[in-house]
Amino acid sequence: DPLLPWRRARRAYGVFLEVMAEAARAFGAYLLAGSLLSPPYEEELARGRFSRTPFFQNLALFFNPKGRLLAQVPKMELTPPERWLRRGRFGPHLVETEAGKVGILICLDGFYERHLARLDALGAEILLQPSANPAPWERPWPPDPARKEGEVWVASAQARLLGREHLRLLLNPMLNGEVAGLGFQGRSGIYAPGEALRLAQAPTGDEALLLRL
């Protein structure tokens, strides 16, 4: 069936949407569910759920505490294994909520200064950067083997908010475990300008990071 990938994607999107909306309602919290490889879908009264494009993207879905989908955010900068995906365009990456203005950049997007500067100039106060790094946390960092991967990651996150007009808080949840034959490691963190406020104790395994502001 040549259309099987799209049929599966539509079903997976529906399940993902329903489960994450339910989780947001259950916890009464804003929830960023990232990420999902799928065409972006819309809903309209007569047509139901549909997509305007057949192209797959790397998408993060952002929900409010009532389980309402606020934004469907596409990744803009793609890694070599993602080159079969369609690059997203800037747009839904800034969301104004009752808790403040939230910027969303998926993994690699958050390392590009032009995306950070744009969100900061638009007034984003909180940056959400869901990440998946398929590399050992303690390996030598390829551009500078004298430093370790994790060391560079944390230092970069601490520096990312320095000197900004509005950005004050960075939440960087990191995928751990085996997915599609790849091993992912990373210490999730909550950062302020120049410092890590909370860091997961290890680059593998599950851990909840809580911060009272």
Q: Which functions belong to the PLM regions below?
A:
Residues 1-6:
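A charged helix-plus-loop insertion that forms the helical arch/lid used to bind
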Residues 12-32, 110-208:
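CN hydrolase (nitrilase-like) catalytic-core segments centered on the catalytic cysteine
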Residues 34, 58-62, 93-94, 187-191, ...:
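Short beta-strand scaffold segments in enzyme catalytic cores
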Residues 45, 52, 57-70, 181-203:
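Short, glycine-anchored, charge-dense loop/turn motifs used at functional sites
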Residues 72-75, 100-109, 128:
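Active-site-proximal beta-strand elements of phosphoester/diester hydrolases
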Residues 75-89, 206-213:
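A short, polar/charged loop-to-alpha-helix boundary motif
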Residues 86-99:
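Glycine-/acidic-rich phosphate or pyrophosphate-binding loops and their flanking alpha/beta elements
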